[in-house]
Every structure is written in C-alpha cells, then in structure tokens.
Amino acid sequence: MKYLLIALGGGTGSLARYLLGTAITSRVGARFPIGTMVVNVSGCFAIGLAMTLLTERLQPHPYWRLALVVGFLGGYTTFSSFEWETYAAVREGGFWIGLANVLGSVTLGYAAVWFGALLARR
C-alpha cells in the first residue's frame, strides 16, 4: 500500500509541477526560470507546513507522510526536501552543516548540470 501511495502522490506532484510551471512561463516568458522558482519556493513552503503539521501537531498515520511528502512533494520538487534538510540541520544547531549543504548542493548541482550538458554535446 505504501508504494502505491508514494507513486500516486509522486505522479500527482509531477503533474502539478508541470502544469503550474508551464502556466507561469507561458504568461511571463522563459527568459528567467520563474515557473521553476515558483514551484521550488512553493514546495519549500509546503514541506515546512506539512512536516511541521505531520510531526508536531497532527501525528497521523505514517502513510500520510509517504503520500504527501515523499510522493507529492517528491514529484513536485526535490528542492523542498533539500531545504527541509538544511532547515533541520540549522535548527538542531548545525549552522555549518546547513551552510555546507547549501553551498555544496548548489555548486555541485550546477557543476553536474554543466558536465551533463557537456557530455550530451559530444
């Protein structure tokens, strides 16, 4: 059952990302990736809201976290997971771990995109 919930959530999140991102880009233009930014930032808000509610206030069945966070937000954006993990590290006193996560993820992520594009062009 948990795999089905993750898959359904992931498919729904991916579709939501595509629909929202393309709707914004079609209205604003593609010069700056505002559609992706809106998706990523809204995903960050959603994971902050969802994880806090699910772990501190509501404490529902663990399947809710799988469907909403791992599934939907995982399909919607992985950026939200990255930001939550950074937030959690800083909140628990690991400022330098959080900073290293931000700098490392952005730097390595950019380098990976650059390298992948380089390989694809060969």
UniProtKB/Swiss-Prot annotation:
Q: In what way does this protein cross or attach to the membrane?
A: Multi-pass membrane protein
Record-level GO cellular component terms: plasma membrane
Is Signal given among the entry's keywords? Answer: no
Keyword Membrane carried by entry: yes
Q: Where in the cell is it found?
A: Cell inner membrane
Record text on activity regulation: Na(+) is not transported, but it plays an essential structural role and its presence is essential for fluoride channel function.
Enzymatic reactions: fluoride(in) = fluoride(out)
Question: Which ranges does the record mark as transmembrane?
Answer: 4-24, 34-54, 66-86, 95-115
Q: Which Pfam families match?
A: CRCB
Alphabetical keyword list: Cell inner membrane, Cell membrane, Ion channel, Ion transport, Membrane, Metal-binding, Sodium, Transmembrane, Transmembrane helix, Transport
Q: Which GO terms describe its molecular function?
A: fluoride channel activity; metal ion binding
InterPro entries the record matches: FluC (IPR003691)
Q: Where does Na(+) bind?
A: G74, T77
Q: Taxonomically, which superkingdom?
A: Bacteria
Q: What GO biological process terms are annotated to this protein in UniProt?
A: cellular detoxification of fluoride
Q: Give the family per the record.
A: Belongs to the fluoride channel Fluc/FEX (TC 1.A.43) family.
Q: HAMAP family under this entry? A: FluC
Tell me the protein's name.
Fluoride-specific ion channel FluC
Source organism (scientific name)? Solibacter usitatus (strain Ellin6076)
Query: Gene that codes for this?
Result: fluC
